[in-house]
Amino acid sequence: MMISEIRQELTDHIIPFWNKLRDDENGGFYGYLSYGLELDKKADKGVILHSRILWFYSNAYMTLGGDELLDNAKHAYEFIKNNCIDYEYGGVYWMMDFEGKPADTMKHTYNIAFAIYALSSYYRASGDKEALALAYRLFEDIEKNTLDEYGYREAFDRQWRLVDNEALSENGLKADKTMNAILHLIEAYTELYKADGNEKVADRLKFQLGQMRDIVYTPDTNALKVFFDTAFNLVGDIHSYGHDIEATWLMDRACDVLGDEDLKKQFAEMDLKISHNIQDIALEDGALNNERDKNEIDKTRVWWVQAEAVVGFINAYQHSGDEKFLESAKSVWENIKEYIIDKREGGEWYSEVTFDHTPHDYKETVGPWKCPYHNGRMCMEVITRGVDI
């Protein structure tokens, strides 16, 4: 039942919605659609948004087939290749204007990771070796420019001079390093290794997994720390429920793709503990709360957190056989259907909904961070994993 509903959500709602945002005049996809569903054709175009769109269409094509999906993937790829990559200094820009010229030339490890993730997927979908070469180019840019003695630094100007990491900091905190960036490096390097089996990529992926296991994970609480200074001293006291449940299945996937049996065993055990913890402390009224900051729980229902919860709980069920995880996945999907999916003509998913189910009307429908990657990926993961309820 759930698979057929989610397949229909992907094919009849999410894909048609994003198809309409293709910009054939200036390239790429339009960068902003308001909560009121007003399209701004002259809004800046986020590079993260475009990497996620490229990943989405590439994987939708590999999951469903269909020339239109591959054509839209190619359209996103051409925009990234021709506009977003800095061929002089390396990396990708942070933001383009509506015509495809650089609007913000900041370099960010997280942003470059998403470009690698997308280009690797596009190579797998299309066989275009130029896309794989660009993914490796960006991989080398990260490895050459962002490492210090402890790990990966995150925020730089165009010429790789360190700047404040405002893009991934929040709650009034400034962090030099974040769990979020490490997680999405793992995601990107997993996809690149899956595409081509390069051992240097495997070595760096194992290093990142080791950081998650040995530094970011807290065995006492079965939770992931969020913000750090340069030397990985903790900054703040935040627990991000969505990132925890997303990390469980992404780390399991990385170990599966690497084929390392010792790592698979270690992480399956750790990830199940994290999944149980999230189920116990964050699942409330059929949905996942957002985060804890010190002693305050933010109960906002954020679209991407709900999508990752469905995948994470299904993954935990597959590793444990515990039916409670399936029940949790089902409850979150039912909540998504009822309250997160925007049923207005021309809508997609609400960005955020309050605990009592009121959408936040100040949060856009499409923007630099609001994309088809989390909800689209949830649909594809449910379809390919084949676990039904």
Swiss-Prot record:
The keyword Glycosyltransferase does not apply. Keywords: Isomerase. One of its GO terms (molecular function) is cellobiose epimerase activity. GO terms for biological process: carbohydrate metabolic process. It catalyses: D-cellobiose = beta-D-glucosyl-(1->4)-D-mannopyranose. It holds the Pfam family GlcNAc_2-epim. Catalyzes the reversible epimerization of cellobiose to 4-O-beta-D-glucopyranosyl-D-mannose (Glc-Man). This is Cellobiose 2-epimerase. It comes from Ruminococcus albus (strain ATCC 27210 / DSM 20455 / JCM 14654 / NCDO 2250 / 7). The lineage of its organism: Bacteria, Bacillati, Bacillota, Clostridia, Eubacteriales.
